[in-house]
Regions:
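Bacterial N-terminal signal peptides
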Residues: 8-18
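Tryptophan-centered motif/residue detector
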Residues: 44, 83, 134-136
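N-terminal cleavable signal peptides for secretion/export
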Residues: 2, 17-74, 78-80, 91-101
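Intrinsically disordered regions, especially transient/low-confidence alpha-helical propensity segments
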Residues: 11-13, 80, 132
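Bacterial N-terminal signal peptides that target proteins for export
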Residues: 1-8
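Solvent-exposed helix/loop surface patches that form functional interfaces
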Residues: 25-27, 92-136
Length: 136
């Protein structure tokens, strides 16, 4: 159960795709409207910052569903990933639902493994782990 919550934020895979399999836009940003039943209910924004062989990816998702002008559902997610030479090396993420559920994780490359900590404690994960970041 502990690992399940962490794994919902990260996808473990043995076959990593090249980080640049998704072309990074020239302006460094991708913005989407989140649409439900033909109505915009939120936004999903991704910002890419490159400096030599380091890529920082910041993701912000904000969703709010209203029924008769009253908020019926809210979801927010923020994450920052660091990639060095195409390798996933660090993450900080926070997801907040409209109820009491709130998830956070911090993780970092550690030689032969990926060390992560969050609401369920600390975990040592496979080095080939990838975040579920919706862009790569």
């Amino acid at each position: 159960m502990i690992k399940l919550r962490i794994i919902t934020l990260l996808i473990v895979t043995l076959f990593c795709l090249d980080i640049y399999s998704f072309p990074i836009p020239k302006n460094g940003e991708v913005k989407f409207d989140v649409i439900r039943k033909n109505k915009v209910i939120g936004s999903h924004e991704i910002r890419f910052t490159e400096n030599d062989d380091v890529l920082i990816v910041e993701t912000n998702i904000d969703i709010e569903v209203k029924v008769l002008f009253v908020s019926a559902y809210e979801f927010a997610h923020q994450s920052t990933e660091t990639w060095i030479s195409g390798n996933f090396t660090k993450i900080t993420a926070h997801s907040d639902f409209e109820d009491e559920r709130e998830y956070f994780i911090k993780g970092q490359d550690n030689n032969d493994s990926f060390l992560a900590s969050g609401m369920d404690g600390k975990l040592e994960l496979n080095k080939n782990i990838l975040p579920s970041n919706f862009w790569n």
